[in-house]
Curated annotation (Swiss-Prot):
Disulfide bridges in this chain: none
UniProt name for this protein: Protein OPG157
Region (Disordered): 53-77
Role of this protein: Required for the association between the dense viroplasm and the viral membranes to form the mature virion (MV).
Quaternary structure and partners: Interacts with protein OPG092; the interaction stabilizes both proteins. Interacts with protein OPG062.
Superkingdom field: Viruses
Phosphoprotein listed as a keyword: yes
Amino acid sequence: MEDLNEANFSHLLINLSNNKDIDAQYASTLSVVHELLSAINFKIFNINKKSKKNSKSIEQHPVVHHAASAGREFNRR
């Protein structure tokens, strides 16, 4: 069996849930599964978008660390 990509799987769920020859409860379950997958994909999309935005921000404004020499401590009083 070939791997199903996301679009094909979504299309399959929609077609099966709209099929008049299957049990209504089964069709409802398929619709719920489709909605859950859509919600998960939306969350993943937003996380990826936020991650890309953060990585671009870091590239534009690199963090500079000022380290003390080994064995020396700062007196911060």
